[in-house]
């Protein structure tokens, strides 16, 4: 029953779309209009470089900050696992993160 009502029409539609003249790509599209993987990688590297410059300009030591926030990791991992369904657990995560943030996070978080 499922094959005749869903799967067979899906295969017919797929066959008709792939047999369409010119395919489904717009006629005026060219390779030049599509971003390449190299361009995306260059943009990613530029974003990382800018982030690194900004964090170093703010005297942020990410390694020290993350190690100081490790005390709140258990509460926050549990809160993320609940996907926002347990509000008290979310509040506990926020409370432990703000209380365990030390001077190491001064340039990173505030």
Curated annotation (Swiss-Prot):
N-terminal signal peptide: 1-32
Assembly and oligomerization: Homodimer.
Cofactor mode of binding and number, as noted: Binds 1 Ca(2+) ion per monomer.
Keyword terms: Calcium, Disulfide bond, Glycoprotein, Secreted, Signal
Induction field: Most abundant protein released by H.capsulatum. Its production continues as the yeast multiplies inside host cells.
Compartment(s): Secreted, Extracellular space
SS bonds (residue pairs): 60-108, 65-105, 76-93
Cellular component, GO annotation: extracellular region
Protein name per its UniProtKB record: Calcium-binding protein
Required cofactor names: Ca(2+)
Gene3D superfamilies cross-referenced by the UniProt entry: 1.10.1740.120
Name of the encoding gene: CBP1
Keyword Lipid metabolism: no
Predominant location: secreted
A Pfam family per the record: CBP
Temperature dependence (free text): Thermostable up to 53 degrees Celsius.
Species of provenance: Ajellomyces capsulatus (strain G186AR / H82 / ATCC MYA-2454 / RMSCC 2432) (Darling's disease fungus)
Function: Involved in calcium binding and uptake in yeast phase. Required for growth in limiting calcium conditions and for yeast survival in host macrophages. Is able to bind a variety of lipids.
Post-translational modification: May be glycosylated.
